[in-house]
Amino acid sequence: GVQISQISSFPTTADVSYDFNITNALGGIQPVGSLK
């Protein structure tokens, strides 16, 4: 599926990296979060 890489900065100054895997035409999204 389509993989989207997104990096977000929260007020807690934590950087969270998300890999979104769209698995089907229904738009199923599986977010995998990694704290660094």
From Swiss-Prot:
GO cellular component, one term: extracellular region
EC category: hydrolase
UniProt superkingdom: Eukaryota
GO biological process: cellulose catabolic process
MF annotations from Gene Ontology: cellulase activity
Function: Has carboxymethylcellulase activity.
Name assigned to this protein: Endoglucanase Cel12A
UniProt source species: Gloeophyllum trabeum
Taxonomy of the source species: Eukaryota, Fungi, Dikarya, Basidiomycota, Agaricomycotina
